[in-house]
Structure formats: structure tokens, C-alpha cells
Amino acid sequence: MLILASASQSRKKLLENSQIEFIQISSNFDEALVKEKDISNLTLELSFQKASRIALNIQEIDLPEKFNYSSVEILGCDSIFEFNGRPFGKPSDKDEAYRRWSQMSGEFGFLHTGHTLLFSTFDSSSKILKVTKKIKKTVSSKVYFSKLQDEEIKNYVDSLEPLYCAGGFALEGKGGKYIERIDGCFSNVMGLSLPWLRKSLIKEGIFP
């Protein structure tokens, strides 16, 4: 059984649409605890910490009543948008979102998503979980933005969508129409590389 160690609705929808069986549990990990300047390495470490937190605290988590699986896979993810070498997380307010979009208009950046997959054995009666293997990788996608009119930027920022997304845009939402093209994994831009997940599971004999 796959556990998605994230509260992200985008990642949840990706797994649901792919008909991959899973349960979603937020790790509630404090991202400020990780100090790493390299953006790619930062996303990878954050994904690992999120997955590890679920593994370490599994006995305290209120699991579904019929969670009687002998093997459990825990998936942690974290996404950060890189623009001109700088990390763009979620904008703190509308003013910051407007400034960022004014810079990104007609330009490109990179969406990095760190992935960690912990494979483990699980005793449902004692709720003892033992991690047997981990796979980690950062997947990066190049995102090209359309040249926007100032009014378009204002309207998008006023929708408030940018305030809830890494980089200040949502490919699957209103922001999708402002993205010219993507080089690399499409689903990665939404927070989870489905091809990477599929290949990682299949390597361990799990066919999602």
C-alpha cells in the first residue's frame, strides 16, 4: 500500500487519475528545519524528511481500520520553482506574486520536484514499520511562460491561485493557459513525476 506523505491536492489528484491505490497522510514537517542552498538538493532532502517523518511516527498515526498490509511504500515529495538561479516558493502575498509574474512573463524557469520512496515491511497488529530500502531522485522540468499583458497578470494574481503554488502558478488550474510549453516530465510540474514513480515501483516488483 502506498502512503502519500503530503497534503497536496495536486499530487492526490494525479494518483487518483492514474488509479493508483493509496492513502494520503500529511507529514506536517517544518521545512524551515532544512538548510540547503542547492535547490535540487533542497527538494530532495525535504522529500526525504517528509517520508521519514511518516515512517518514524507510524504508530501515532490514525490509520484506516482495515490497514492490514504487510508491505508499505511511503512517498515524499517537495517542489520548488527556480527562476534565474533563485528559488521561488509560494508567494507570501499578492504583491510578491505580481512582481514574480512580471519577471517570469515571456521567460522560462525550472520546476524541481524531489521524490523519496521508502519501501518497508509492516506489522498491522503492532504497527511496527521497518524501512528496507529507499529510492531518491530530483526530477526537473523546464517551463516556458507566455508573454503576458499587465492586465492578465493582475487578473491571475487577483484569483489568489498563485499564492498556493510553488513558483506562483498552477499548470492544472487557471495558470495553465499562461504556460507556452514544457520540456521534460509534464506531471512533475504538478508536483509528482508519475513516470518516475511507476518505474521505481516496478523495479521492486510492484505494478501500480
UniProtKB/Swiss-Prot annotation:
The keyword Repeat does not apply. GO terms for cellular component: cytoplasm. Coiled coil: none annotated. Nucleoside triphosphate pyrophosphatase. May have a dual role in cell division arrest and in preventing the incorporation of modified nucleotides into cellular nucleic acids. Keywords: Cytoplasm, Hydrolase, Nucleotide metabolism. SUPFAM superfamilies: ITPase-like. HAMAP family: Maf. Its main location: cytoplasm. Its EC number is 3.6.1.9. It catalyses: a ribonucleoside 5'-triphosphate + H2O = a ribonucleoside 5'-phosphate + diphosphate + H(+); a 2'-deoxyribonucleoside 5'-triphosphate + H2O = a 2'-deoxyribonucleoside 5'-phosphate + diphosphate + H(+). InterPro entries: ITPase-like_fam (IPR029001), Maf-like (IPR003697). This is Nucleoside triphosphate pyrophosphatase. Its cofactor is a divalent metal cation. The keyword Cytoplasm applies. It is found in: Cytoplasm. The lineage of its organism: Bacteria, Bacillati, Cyanobacteriota, Cyanophyceae, Synechococcales. Belongs to the Maf family.
